[in-house]
Amino acid sequence: MAKKLKRPRRPAVPRRRRPLTASARPARLPQRLDLRRCEQFLLHEARLLDEGKFDDWLALFTPEAWYWVPSEPDQADPVETVSLIYDDRRLLETRVRRLASPRMYSQEPRSRTSRMIGNVTIEETGKGFATVRSKFIMIEYRREQQRLFGGTALHRLVQTDGRVMIAWKH
């Protein structure tokens, strides 16, 4: 009877983790909103927008949230002056619903975007919130043309039921 040969044991190879997709990336943070956690949240938000996951992006906002894009850099008040965007949560929902519509002719063909977020700093912190300032560059590709937008964004990030959300953004 032939003797069974033992195969040499292969060294253990660490299993590769599946890469996190934007929708799988956790938005939950520990109690403290530190710089690294805030930066990761902003990168997650940018990725959702670049991938066109607007419903997931909308889910990052609290029910009382607002989003303001001033028309001038030194604009201090969204009510007394003209703004590019000044939306509460309900208007954000309408905006997202319109973007999903096949009749959104202003986005035919759809824009492809790439956002870069940097120079993230925490301006103010408190119990369960942080006001975060960041710089951004957004490149839009559409109709064989490229447009570049840049600016400063302010986010008020809050923790609600252990989850980080946007209370306001401008």
Predicted regions and their residues:
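A solvent-exposed, acidic/Ser-Thr-rich amphipathic alpha-helical stretch
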Residues: 63-133
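Short helix-to-loop capping/linker segments positioned immediately adjacent to catalytic or ligand/cofactor-binding
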Residues: 45-47, 103-110, 142-144
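Short, low-complexity N-terminal intrinsically disordered segments enriched in polar/charged residues
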Residues: 15-63
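Conserved aromatic-histidine-acidic binding/catalytic patches
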Residues: 30-33, 80, 145
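Short Lys/Arg-rich cationic patches that frequently serve as NLS/NoLS or arginine-rich RNA/DNA-binding motifs
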Residues: 1-23
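A beta-strand edge to alpha-helix "cap/lid" segment located at domain peripheries
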Residues: 114, 121-170
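Hydrophobic pocket/interface hotspot
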Residues: 45, 57, 92, 132, ...
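A generic "alpha-helical surface" signal
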Residues: 36-40, 83, 90, 148
